[in-house]
Each structure stands twice: as structure tokens, then as C-alpha cells.
């Protein structure tokens, strides 16, 4: 990596946009404007220090950086059929940089690309494998130490090279200085020679002037010229010697420098080769250790030693031509390992790939190469059909035989419902084995049929395994995590009070007086058919009230009210005393473990006896405080308001004793009191918050339904934003109408809420299907023997979930052995067109309880003759359905004697038989009536009349005191004095 890069290149390395990097550089104090601006190492250090400071970490002086680069490539490999297959290969490269003292980053370690290839496992003794693994580990440790020593040597060599370079620079400077001095001396010599020549020229005319030349002395000019030549020659020789000396010295310096560089280069290359060799040896040692570990952990297989030469040649589309006399290539024993030098190459051998390719190569015949000799009977395509058929016999495929293991007892966790295939998978056997065992147990099942928990556990025990009751895949376990994470402070909360008692004892009127509102007048028939929730502010604090129905059909509603409450107000009318629903309310309160405050109502009526009421309550186990019990008795009048304040004081006193607390700053939890389907708002649920705070927008899980709270209303219909503990509210936004009595909770993860709701819905469905299947199999023969049973199919649509539940239970109780109520569907909301279509298909009666049908549904019902009945009071619905079922009952048959006649004469007529002449002694004789023949007060014959005549005319009836003639049908053994008794069979309607 270069020391100077541009902003754009550095941003690409960091996977950031150049604009973001420029902003960070500007914040770090590095002024960069464009992406093409250069970026130095100091700028990068400033940016790194700024980022460390901004993230709150101390910038450490990092000496070593390792970069890991992963790249995925693909190679094409041809199988035995010639088709190319693409194989992904992942290559991992590592590069380590160490910061030197001179500030440069030098790569000290570059890991070879690692290609993931499956190790070939060879069978060996465990002790030998352990020894080899230890040896490989020691070898790897030795390589690591050698690598550390090599790094230290390299550092020392670098320091020595730096010192030698400094000394070399000094020698070069000295040589250059000497060369400069030699050049200067040569220049000085040349200058001196020039000056001498010039002086000689000046001397020549002076001599001519002073001395007259003799005719015999012409040698003066020759001597001067010779002297000049000598001087020039001496200067040139001196200059050339100095230049030669400088050149020789420079050449010597250059040769020394080149030798030093060559030596350094050779040492560097040798060190690099040694590092590569060490790295390669280290990689091989680690690979060998990994192979040994894989061999230790791999299951043992029994391998067949035979390997066909044709199969041993992998990855070759066209087999090489082998001469008939040539020797076949030797088969490498146990897949010979790759050569040591080929470890760094990207080679993917086909024998290291998936075993399915080996199977394909073994099963399918290879394509013969061009020019290969044709050998008959060896699988060649020119050898005829016999050769093709016999080709597979010579090739023995690789055996995948697994040594048999002894039976292993498994712990099988059985949920509430499980299919046959899932149960077989848990026991690691085939589904057919489970089906066989179930057939032995007398159950005919299919592979996808759900089994209940008891049946599945019996099968597991029969198969020899251990059955455990569990639901490991239950996502509801995550709900506990969310609850445990909340550690909020518990604060005092308002009590939740449930008003219970018999019907028409004044529960709603009492609550109405407390709330100062007219609630009872709004209920149909003056009786409560819904569970109501209200909260009231009193001088001593807030109290939340739950008003439950008193009718016997609303048992489930009362049970829910008792479970959600803190205190129960048991309302008993002073004139009626303890009634059946009063006893039931006491049982619900005892089961819930809540204190009871008894309110004896209607004390303003004349002729009441409070002591009688107290005695009846003591008989049921509710003992007043004045008798030494724990239940306060308060006489009240909902009409005049007498005793209401005392009742509230007793309730708040009980609440103080209980010390009711709940967390406020946590996720809300509570109970679904009531639910209905509103045509405009969708599913609406009345919930009571028991802990935490419910807010608009929270994700709520209620049973098998979920949703986000879109709106919240109080009991007066006013919108609110939050609801704390003990506050009843109406919420909207659920996906479906929840079941009344379900727990609801607020969770933070909507995806997890959806998973839990889906799991609960599927669990409910599977449990229901399993129960239905079991009942069908068990009751199959009993239904055949019972004969035809009349069914009354009904569809119930109610306004709220509680009313629908109560009405359905009341109507199902009307079923008898002859007429059964078949509940096709029950739901909440108005009667829609789909409900009418369901009634048409099932021939059911539609019952609307406080609901009506829309225009399309009414029109379709009229066109198809569907009966829709509307009710507001549960009594009327039960009574009318009871009458309808009574009409479906088979009427009873009853005999009624209408008259007697005495035989006084017998007439024999051919072709007719005996004709009896009779006198009607009592009642009347009719032609259509049945007759009994009595002889000596013993019945001899019972049958019908063939004819009845008075004189010669046919008669329909003959009254008392008249004579008649009659003939019995198919009977002639009559005697004088026999008595004929006439009777009719009448049908009498039955009632339930």
C-alpha cells in the first residue's frame, strides 16, 4: 500500500462515500475539499486519533495490523456425463503490516490463500492419531519459534544494512572529493603550462633586439619549440594520470556498491523464500493436525479395499487411450495426497468433492475417447446390447456399509399433539414402524395424523425409549423473559370488587346506586346478561367494580369475575334467602381464595327475617363476624340507599388488610373480561389491567389473538390514553375477537407476538382435531348401534363473547339421546351473508342474541327459507328451542279401548270363512279399530277387522246396544261366547 493515496481511494477502502470521509477529515482538522486531494499517512493518523477520541477510546500505538481478505470464486468441473457443474471456492488471504521505526509499513507476513477442501479420513488407531496430533502441534510450535527468530534476524539485518548504507554514502562522498581534487590539480597544471608558453613568446623579441644574431646560431627557435613540447607533454601526462586515477576510484566504488546491493537483494530473497517455506510448513502442520482431529471425531466405516482403475480416474471426461500391451496405471493407495509444492495452487480435485459425484461416476458409463480400442462385453456402446447390460456387473461401486450399532435409548420430548411422522423423526425410525405399533394397539392412523400426548407417550415407551412431557418448540417461553426483565417498583393499587349473587337479588341496582347511574334499566328484562366493569371514586379512594350475571347460564362469567377480583360482594335478598346461584357464587369465591363481604339487600321490604338469612349462609360456610367468622354482613337497600356507605367502608377496610400492590412503570398485564365484534370498529375487548400501564399503541397478546391498541375507551365511552392497574378499559385493534377470560399482556417485539399467537392457534386446532378423531374412532360402533339420532343444527350470533358462550352452553344442555343440538358455528357480531350461506349449507336455524341481520342477509334468508330468530332474553331463547326440540321427539303411542262385543252366533260362508254375529255390549265398534279376541279372559288373537256390516249394509261404526256382523282378517277360529275387545292407538306428544 502506497504512503500517499487520494481521498476517493481511501473512502473506497473504508466502504464509505467520499463526502462522508471529507466531513470526518474536516472534523479531525485535515483540510480536504475534493475527492482527488492527496491523503498522507499523517492525515490518516490524525483521522484515526479523532475517531478514537470521538468513540471514547484511547488511541494506542499499534505496531501490527493484519488484513483479512475473503474472495469467492467459481470453477467449472465436468462430471462423468459431460455436464459442467459450478463449484464455489472461498479463498482467504491474510496480510500483516508492522510499523517500523522509520515510519514505513513493511509487509512481514502474507498468508497463503486457504481453500476449504474436505480432509480425507483414513482409518488408524486412536493412540497413533493422538501421537501424530501432538507431534503436529509441536511441529507447529517449532515453526512459530523459527518464524519469530527469522523476524528478529530480519530486523537486525535491516539495521546492519542501514549502517552499511551510511558508511557507503561516506565512502562515495570521499571518492567524489578526491576526484574533484584531482580535476582541480589537472586544471592548475594546464594553466601553468599555458602561462609558461606565453612567457616564452615574450622573451623571443627581446633577445633579437639586444643581440645581433650571428649567422651561425639558428638553434634558438628550435630550443624554444622543444621546450614548449616538453612542457605540454608533461602537463598532458599529469592530467591523464589524474583522470585515470579518478575513473578507477569511481569504478571501484561503483563495483563495491553493486556488490553490496546484490548481496542485500540475495539475502532478502533468501529470507523471503525461507518465510514462504516456513509459512507453507506451518500451514501443512496445522492442516495435518486438523485432519487428525477430524479423523478422531469421524465415525468409523468399514471400507472395501477394492478400487477399480476405471473409477479411480476422476475429473476426466475422455479417458486416455491405453495400448493393449501397455501396463495399466497404478492406483494410488488411499487417495495419494497432493505434492508439497502444490499446496499454494488453487486446485480442486474431483475426488475431494461430494460423494454423490462419485456415485454418479460409478453408476453411469463414461463416454469413450476417440481411437479407443473396442473391447466386446466391456460396456462399450459398440459392443451390442449384451455388452451394455453386462457393463455394470464388472464395476463394483464403492460400498457405504455402516457397521451396525447397538440400540440406543433416546429421551423423546412429546408435546400435547404430534403427528406420526414427527414422532418417528424424534425416535430416528421410519414412520411405518410407528404405524405398525399403533395398529397393534388397535388404532388405524396415517402418516400425517395428529396423536394426543398420552397415545404418543405409550408408543414411545413401547418402542423402548423414554417419553418426557414437554413442548420444546413452545415460543411462549419467551414471554417469561420479557416479564423477568421488568423490575419496577410495586405501588398500592385500587381493589377490584366483584358483585355476585342470585338473579333478581338486586346486584345491578346496588351497583347502580353506588355509581349514581341507571344501568339496570338498560338491560333487557331487567336482568344482567353482560359482565360490566366500572371504577368509582369514593372519599377513601378508588374502587373498581365487576358486575356479573346471576342467571344459571352465566356460570363461566361468574367464574371469570371471581378469578379477576380481590374482594367479592355477595348480594343476598332478605326476602328470598340463599338460592342456587348464591351457593355457586360462594363456591367461586372460595375457589379463587378471595374474602367475601355479604350485602343483605331489600331490607326495606316488610316481613323480612335477617336471622334466617344469616343462618342459611352459615350453613353454606359463610360465617358473620358477630358469630366469630371472617365475613362482614352489611344490611343494605339499593332502593333507599341505606347501608351503602357502611358497605363501601367494609370493602375498603378489607382492601387495606390485603395490602394490594402492583407495578405501574412496566408493561401491562391483565384479563380479558368481555369481547365483542363491532361492525364499525372491529373486534372490541373489555380488559382489566392488573399490573403495569396500558398505553395506546402497545402491542397486545390476548390468547391466540394479537394486535396494536388503536384506541382505548373507559366505561363511559370516553377516549383515554393510558390505563393503570385496576382500571377496566375497552381496547380496539385486535386481529380477532379474543376469548373471554384469556390473559392479555403487552410485549415489545411484534414479530414474537405474532409467532406466539400463531403457535397458540395451531396448538388449539391440533388438540381439537386430535380429540375429534379419538371420539370418532371410539364412538363409531356405538353410533351404528344407536340408530338414527335427530339433529337440530343451530348457528348462534351474539353481541358479546360471554353471552354467546352462555347461550351455547345452555342450548347444548338440552340435548337428549333422541334429539341433539348441533352447534354449527357461534360467534359475535351481526348476522352477515356468510352466516346465512352457512345456514343454507348445514340446514341450520340462525339465532341472533342482541344482534340483527343486515339487508343482504335478510334477503338471502327469505329467498332460501332460512329461519332467523331474534332474542334479547336468554330465557326466551332456551324456551323456544326447547319447544322446537320437543316437536322433533318421537311421540309416545297409547292404546285406548273404545268398545266390547260378544259373539252370539257364527255363520259359515264359503270363500269368506266364519262370520260372527255380535252384540255391542259397551262403547262403540269402528271398522278401522284393532280387535282382540278374548276366550276365558285370555287373549287368543289380536288383529284387524276384514268387514263390518249391519244387516246387509257396510257400516263404519256400530254403537252400544246394536247387533252387527263382522269378519276377522285371516282368522276363523271363533266360538260362541268369545268377547271381542276393540281399541285404537293414539300418539301422545312428548316434552323434554
Curated annotation (Swiss-Prot):
Q: What positions does the domain tr-type G occupy? A: 492-661
Segments of this protein annotated with the region G5? 637-639
- For whether the record's keyword set contains Protein biosynthesis, the answer is yes
Q: Which Pfam families is this protein grouped with? A: EF-G_D2 (PF22042), GTP_EFTU (PF00009), GTP_EFTU_D2 (PF03144), IF-2 (PF11987), IF2_assoc (PF08364), IF2_N (PF04760)
Q: Where is this region: Disordered?
A: 154-173, 338-399
The ranges of region (G4) come to 601-604
Keyword entries, A-Z: Cytoplasm, GTP-binding, Initiation factor, Nucleotide-binding, Protein biosynthesis
Q: Which family does it belong to?
A: Belongs to the TRAFAC class translation factor GTPase superfamily. Classic translation factor GTPase family. IF-2 subfamily.
Q: What is the name of the protein in this document?
A: Translation initiation factor IF-2
Species this chain originates from: Polaromonas naphthalenivorans (strain CJ2)
Amino acid at each position: 500500500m502506497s504512503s500517499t493515496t487520494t481521498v476517493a481511494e481511501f473512502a473506497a477502502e473504508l466502504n464509505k462515500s467520499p463526502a462522508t470521509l471529507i466531513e470526518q477529515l474536516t472534523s479531525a482538522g485535515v483540510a480536504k475539499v475534493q475527492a482527488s486531494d492527496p491523503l498522507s499517512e499523517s492525515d490518516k493518523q490524525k483521522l484515526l486519533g479523532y475517531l478514537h477520541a470521538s468513540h471514547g477510546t484511547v488511541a494506542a500505538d499499534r505496531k501490527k495490523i493484519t488484513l483479512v481478505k475473503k474472495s469467492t470464486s467459481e470453477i467449472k468441473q465436468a462430471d462423468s456425463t459431460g455436464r459442467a457443474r459450478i463449484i464455489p471456492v472461498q479463498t482467504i488471504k491474510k496480510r500483516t503490516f508492522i510499523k517500523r521505526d522509520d515510519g514505513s509499513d513493511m509487509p512481514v507476513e502474507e498468508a497463503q490463500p486457504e481453500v476449504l477442501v474436505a480432509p480425507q479420513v483414513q482409518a488408524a488407531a486412536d493412540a497413533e492419531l493422538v501421537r501424530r496430533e501432538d507431534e503436529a502441534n509441536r511441529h507447529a510450535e517449532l515453526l512459530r519459534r523459527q518464524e519469530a527468530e527469522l523476524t528478529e534476524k530480519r530486523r537486525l539485518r535491516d539495521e546492519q544494512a542501514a549502517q552499511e548504507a551510511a558508511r557507503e554514502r561516506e565512502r562515495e562522498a570521499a571518492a567524489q572529493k578526491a576526484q574533484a581534487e584531482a580535476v582541480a590539480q589537472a586544471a592548475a597544471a594546464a594553466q601553468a603550462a599555458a602561462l609558461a608558453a606565453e612567457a616564452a613568446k615574450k622573451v623571443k623579441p627581446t633577445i633579437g633586439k639586444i643581440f645581433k644574431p650571428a649567422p651561425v646560431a639558428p638553434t634558438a627557435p628550435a630550443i624554444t619549440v622543444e621546450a614548449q613540447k616538453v612542457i605540454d607533454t608533461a602537463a598532458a601526462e599529469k592530467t591523464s594520470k589524474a583522470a585515470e586515477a579518478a575513473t578507477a576510484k569511481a569504478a571501484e566504488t561503483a563495483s563495491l556498491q553493486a556488490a553490496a546491493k546484490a548481496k542485500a537483494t540475495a539475502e532478502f530473497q533468501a529470507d523471503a523464500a525461507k518465510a514462504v517455506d516456513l509459512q507453507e510448513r506451518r500451514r501443512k502442520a496445522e492442516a495435518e493436525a486438523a485432519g487428525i482431529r477430524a479423523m478422531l471425531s469421524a465415525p468409523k466405516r468399514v471400507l472395501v479395499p477394492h478400487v477399480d482403475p476405471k473409477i479411480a480416474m476422476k475429473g476426466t471426461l475422455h479417458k486416455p487411450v491405453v495400448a493393449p500391451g501397455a501396463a495399466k496405471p497404478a492406483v494410488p493407495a488411499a487417495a495419494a495426497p497432493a505434492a508439497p509444492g502444490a499446496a499454494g495452487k488453487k486446485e480442486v480435485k474431483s475426488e475431494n468433492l461430494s460423494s454423490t459425484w462419485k456415485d454418479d461416476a460409478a453408476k453411469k458409463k463414461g463416454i469413450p475417447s476417440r481411437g479407443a480400442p473396442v473391447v466386446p462385453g466391456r460396456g462399450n456402446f459398440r459392443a451390442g446390447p449384451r455388452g451394455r447390460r453386462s457393463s455394470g456387473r464388472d464395476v463394483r461401486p464403492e460400498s457405504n456399509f455402516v457397521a451396525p450399532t447397538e440400540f440406543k435409548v433416546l429421551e423423546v420430548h412429546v408435546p400435547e399433539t404430534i403427528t406420526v411422522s414427527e414422532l418417528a423423526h424424534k425416535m430416528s425410525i421410519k414412520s411405518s414402524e410407528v404405524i405398525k405399533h399403533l395398529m397393534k394397539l388397535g388404532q388405524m392412523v396415517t402418516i400425517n395424523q395428529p396423536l394426543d400426548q398420552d397415545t404418543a407417550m405409550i408408543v414411545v415407551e413401547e418402542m423402548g425409549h423414554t417419553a418426557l412431557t414437554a413442548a420444546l418448540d413452545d415460543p411462549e417461553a419467551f414471554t417469561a423473559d420479557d416479564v423477568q426483565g421488568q423490575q419496577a417498583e410495586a405501588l398500592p393499587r385500587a381493589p377490584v370488587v366483584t358483585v355476585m349473587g342470585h338473579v333478581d337479588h338486586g346486584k345491578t341496582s346496588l351497583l347502580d346506586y353506588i355509581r349514581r347511574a341507571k344501568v339496570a334499566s338498560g338491560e333487557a328484562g331487567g336482568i344482567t346478561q353482560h359482565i360490566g366493569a366500572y371504577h368509582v371514586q369514593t372519599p377513601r379512594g378508588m374502587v373498581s367494580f365487576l358486575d356479573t350475571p346471576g342467571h344459571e347460564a352465566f356460570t363461566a362469567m361468574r367464574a371469570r369475575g371471581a378469578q379477576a377480583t380481590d374482594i367479592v360482594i355477595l348480594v343476598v335478598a332478605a326476602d328470598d334467602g340463599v338460592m342456587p346461584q348464591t351457593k355457586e357464587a360462594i363456591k367461586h369465591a372460595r375457589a379463587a381464595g378471595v374474602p367475601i363481604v355479604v350485602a343483605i339487600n331489600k331490607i326495606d321490604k316488610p316481613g323480612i327475617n335477617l336471622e334466617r338469612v344469616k343462618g342459611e349462609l352459615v350453613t353454606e360456610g359463610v360465617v358473620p363476624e358477630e358469630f366469630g367468622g371472617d365475613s362482614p354482613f352489611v344490611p343494605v337497600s339499593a332502593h333507599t340507599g341505606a347501608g351503602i356507605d357502611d358497605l363501601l367502608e367494609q370493602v375498603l377496610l378489607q382492601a387495606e388488610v390485603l395490602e394490594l400492590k402492583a407495578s405501574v412503570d412496566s408493561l401491562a398485564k391483565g384479563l380479558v373480561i368481555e369481547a365483542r365484534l363491532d361492525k364499525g370498529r372491529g373486534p372490541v375487548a373489555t380488559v382489566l389491567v392488573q399490573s403495569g400501564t396500558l398505553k395506546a399503541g402497545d402491542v397486545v397478546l390476548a390468547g391466540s389473538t394479537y394486535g396494536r391498541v388503536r384506541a382505548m375507551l373507559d366505561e363511559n365511552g370516553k377516549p383515554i390514553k393510558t390505563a393503570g392497574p385496576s382500571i377496566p378499559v375497552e381496547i380496539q385493534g385486535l386481529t380477532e375477537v379474543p376469548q373471554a377470560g384469556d390473559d392479555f399482556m403487552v410485549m415489545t417485539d411484534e414479530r414474537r407476538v405474532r409467532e406466539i399467537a400463531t403457535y397458540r392457534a395451531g396448538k388449539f386446532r391440533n388438540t381439537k382435531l386430535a380429540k375429534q378423531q379419538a371420539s370418532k374412532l371410539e364412538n363409531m360402533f356405538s353410533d351404528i348401534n344407536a340408530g338414527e339420532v335427530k339433529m337440530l343444527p343451530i348457528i348462534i350470533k351474539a353481541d358479546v363473547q360471554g353471552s354467546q358462550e352462555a347461550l351455547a352452553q345452555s342450548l347444548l344442555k338440552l340435548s337428549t339421546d333422541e334429539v341433539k343440538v348441533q352447534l354449527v358455528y357461534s360467534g359475535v357480531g351481526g348476522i352477515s351473508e356468510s352466516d346465512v350461506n352457512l345456514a343454507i349449507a348445514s340446514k341450520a336455524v340462525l339465532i341472533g342474541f342482541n344482534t340483527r341481520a343486515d339487508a343482504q342477509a335478510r334477503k338471502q334468508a327469505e329467498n332460501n327459507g332460512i329461519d332467523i330468530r331474534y332474542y334479547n332474553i336468554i330465557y326466551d331463547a332456551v324456551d323456544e328451542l326447547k319447544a322446537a326440540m320437543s316437536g322433533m321427539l318421537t311421540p309416545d303411542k297409547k292404546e285406548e279401548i273404545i268398545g266390547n262385543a260378544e259373539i252370539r252366533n257364527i255363520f259359515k260362508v264359503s270363500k269368506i270363512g266364519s262370520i260372527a254375529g255380535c252384540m255391542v255390549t259397551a262403547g262403540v265398534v269402528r271398522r278401522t279399530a284393532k280387535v282382540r279376541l278374548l276366550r276365558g279372559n285370555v287373549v287368543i288373537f289380536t288383529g284387524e277387522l276384514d268387514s263390518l256390516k249391519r244387516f246387509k249394509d257396510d257400516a263404519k261404526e256400530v254403537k252400544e246396544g246394536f247387533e252387527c256382523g263382522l269378519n276377522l282378517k285371516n282368522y276363523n277360529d271363533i266360538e260362541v261366547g268369545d268377547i271381542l275387545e276393540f281399541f285404537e292407538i293414539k300418539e301422545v306428544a312428548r316434552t323434554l
